[in-house]
Design a protein with these regions (language model features):
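Catalytic-core region of carbohydrate-active enzymes that cleave or remodel glycosidic bonds
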Residues: 303-373
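Non-catalytic accessory regions flanking glycosidase/transglycosidase catalytic cores in CAZymes
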Residues: 21-203, 212, 230-267, 271-285, ...
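Short, flexible/disordered intra-domain loops and linkers
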Residues: 217-224, 263-274, 346-354
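Bacterial N-terminal signal peptides that target proteins for export
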Residues: 1-7
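Catalytic metal-binding/acid-base residues of hydrolase active sites
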Residues: 210-211, 257, 300, 304-305, ...
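Alpha-helix capping and helix-loop boundary segments enriched in small/acidic/polar residues
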Residues: 173-180, 221-230, 311, 352-356
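The feature captures the catalytic groove of carbohydrate-active enzymes
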Residues: 203-225
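Bacterial N-terminal signal peptides
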Residues: 7-16
Length: 373
């Protein structure tokens, strides 16, 4: 209702101005009713991939400046905000492609990560130091919520011995006998980072973009597909591990790469589609997670590939909201950036320091909040 009233008021203002000076526009008055909230914004966050493993090893002065820009809620001496005040920080738990070097088949070192787990089954808590530095810098500036996510299981557990899906199909790059080991690894990482760095991961997502076609076709970065059944199996095992250890970290699903996969199938089959229904409709007996301990009734998705044209931007988010409401599921939009299909601003290559890209991203955020939120 409030959105409709605002649209009418703005249209009326435009018409009044078009009528010339003889018809002055009436005064408009807006009232913010803080006692009548229509939405709850839980977090304003960002991710450390694929940069903080490099930037986190820069000179401390530069790290501090970047951290201020990202996390600070303070003002400088002139009253200007020091930063954008992120409230949540996503940490990419690595799979070990950095240690493999060129043998990882991932061309860019920026797209590789270290792994805490070693080949002999022990842990090296000196790994991923750059990213961990930014965990600490975030906490020092008031960030209280942290989410860990994984693009791939550790290379010691994968079927092809890599952190990328090269040469495989659309199933999880995880050995059948390693599902329980993977769950223990995830729990060990949550406990290990809290013990060594004083950072608690409030949330963890075992699979990042398991429906994304990008991680099935070639070695661009760490990544593994997974079917809904494979995701559900992993989440149930991790839930059991958390319960046994009395851990309250919440397990998130599914960090979808495309809203269309949450609603139906898109560039895949039913095994990786209809995700809202698969995980939160009790009739989906093989994949239902609605009664699984440590799993909130919440879906995570990424705002890629449905950002243009403008009519699609809105329509897709309205459809998403309808499906979420049908199954009484909350929603977090947990990742976005400019991609190749964003042709209106020239695609995702190079740099743009003008307001053009900033306004385009703001439009995406607005539609995610207003129509999908």
């Amino acid at each position: 209702m409030n959105y409709k009233l605002l649209s009418v008021a703005l249209a009326f203002l435009y018409i009044g101005m078009a009528g010339g000076c003889s018809q002055p526009a009436p005064d408009l008055r807006y009232q913010i009713e803080v006692d009548k909230p229509l939405q709850t914004m839980e977090h304003f966050g960002a991710s450390d991939a694929w940069s903080m493993h490099i930037l986190g090893l820069w000179p401390q002065e530069k790290q501090n400046q970047i951290a201020d820009w990202l996390f600070s809620t303070e003002n400088d001496a002139n009253g200007k905000p020091k930063g954008i005040g992120l409230s949540l920080w996503r940490f990419n738990v690595g799979a070990g492609s950095t240690e493999q070097g060129e043998a990882s088949q991932i061309g860019s070192s920026w797209m590789r990560t270290e792994c805490f787990l070693q080949a002999d089954g022990t842990y090296d808590w000196n790994k991923q130091q750059g990213q961990r530095n930014f965990l600490k810098l975030a906490k020092e500036r008031g960030v209280t919520k942290f989410l860990a996510f994984l693009n791939s299981p550790p290379v010691y557990y994968t079927q092809n011995g890599l952190a990328t899906n090269t040469g495989r199909g659309g199933t999880a790059n995880l050995k059948p006998e390693c599902y329980e080991k993977y769950a223990r690894f995830l729990a060990d990482v949550v406990e290990g980072i809290e013990k060594h760095d004083g950072i608690k991961f409030n949330y963890i997502c075992p699979f990042n973009e398991p429906d994304g076609h990008w991680n099935w076709v070639g070695p661009k970065q760490e990544g593994s597909p997974a079917t809904n059944r494979e995701v559900a199996r992993t989440v149930r095992l991790l839930s059991r591990e958390f319960v046994n250890r009395k851990m309250d970290t919440q397990i998130m699903v599914n960090e979808s790469s495309d809203y269309r996969c949450m609603l139906r199938t898109h560039q895949t089959d039913w095994q990786r589609g209809y995700q809202i229904q698969a995980f939160f409709c009790p009739d989906s007996v093989d994949t239902y997670l609605g009664d699984t301990p440590n799993v909130p009734r919440l879906m995570l998705g990424h705002s890629y590939w449905t950002t243009t044209p403008l009519s699609e931007l809105r329509a897709m988010r309205c459809q998403l909201r309808e499906a979420l409401d049908k199954y009484n599921v909350g929603f977090w939009q947990s990742e976005t950036c400019i991609m190749g299909n964003d042709e209106e601003i020239g695609g995702g290559h190079g740099f743009d320091r003008t307001m053009k890209t900033a306004l385009y991203v703001a439009r995406i955020i607005h539609h995610d909040i207003v129509y999908a939120g």
